Amino acid sequence: MSMSTSTEVVAHHWAFAIFLIVAIGLCCLMLIGGWFLGGRARARHKNTPFESGIDSVGTARLRLSAKFYLVAMFFVIFDVEALYLFAWSTSIRESGWVGFVEAAIFILVLLAGLVYLVRIGALDWTPTRSRRELVNPENSNSNRQQ
């Protein structure tokens, strides 16, 4: 590597190197400043959460219903759907009718999945029985008697 090419590389990347040095230095400065300026509480209640003057009751750990995880998964799925449809909509002139048919098939497959989720009761928020039990009441009654 000749001297001129290495100088060119340094000239092109000096701003990024300075950014990295400043970012790492700022992080270290904030951590060290917090360690020096922070209080040293060695009391019995150090690890209890602060509740704005109200005595804490119970633990800080809460059990979330599985419905929250389902909603998060549905959000990610439909967010990815929106991402694909946005990419398709920006290139609609280049893709033409073939792209339109492909996008329509994509939307229909996702709508079929949504209809399936609604039919099995995956989107119901009530903790009562699911729609599977409502569709087949004979099976649910025989299961309860056993």
Swiss-Prot record:
Keywords, ordered alphabetically: Cell inner membrane, Cell membrane, Membrane, NAD, Quinone, Translocase, Transmembrane, Transmembrane helix, Transport, Ubiquinone
The membrane-spanning stretches of this chain are 16-36, 68-88, 98-118
Q: Which top EC class applies here?
A: translocase
Q: How does it sit in the membrane?
A: Multi-pass membrane protein
Record's GO cellular component, any one? Answer: plasma membrane
Q: Which InterPro entries match?
A: NAD(P)H_OxRDtase_bac/plastid (IPR023043), NADH_UbQ/plastoQ_OxRdtase_su3 (IPR000440), NDAH_ubi_oxred_su3_sf (IPR038430)
Q: List locations, semicolon-separated.
A: Cell inner membrane
**Superkingdom of this protein's organism:** Bacteria
GO-annotated molecular function: NADH dehydrogenase (ubiquinone) activity; NADH:ubiquinone reductase (non-electrogenic) activity; quinone binding
Name of the protein this chain belongs to: NADH-quinone oxidoreductase subunit A
Species: Enterobacter sp. (strain 638)
Taxonomy of origin reads: Bacteria, Pseudomonadati, Pseudomonadota, Gammaproteobacteria, Enterobacterales
